[in-house]
A protein has these predicted regions:
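Basic nucleic-acid-binding interfaces
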Residues: 1-3, 18, 45
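Surface-exposed, Lys/Arg-rich phosphate-binding patches that contact polyanionic backbones
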Residues: 15-22
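A short beta-strand-loop micro-motif that forms or neighbors metal/cofactor-
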Residues: 28, 36, 75
Length: 89
């Protein structure tokens, strides 16, 4: 089995820094669920993106991410995190 790493964009880290600890814990637990096989959570493939972006729903938050592969390491790159109404703009 490949090793799985999680990387965050600057935008995602900035959003997490503004949340309370409980909310950050919920989001990080959901992102950790992506490392399972099969991934756990309400996941849908996003249309209109050729890089294979997917979205994970956690309550009213949406986590936009994509999978990247580097030799024996699978990377889950978290592109953005935001509220349902603002994340798709």
């Amino acid at each position: 089995m490949n090793e799985v790493k999680i990387r965050y964009s600057k935008d995602a880290l900035k959003f997490l820094s503004k949340l309370d600890k409980r909310s950050v814990g919920r989001i990080r637990d959901a992102i950790t669920g992506l490392t399972c096989n099969p991934p756990v959570g309400d996941i849908k493939t996003m249309q209109g993106y050729s890089d294979g972006r997917k979205r994970l729903r956690v309550g009213s938050w949406r986590i936009i991410y994509r999978h990247e592969n580097e030799e024996t390491v699978e990377i889950i790159f978290v592109i953005d995190i935001g509220n349902r109404g603002n994340i798709y703009k």
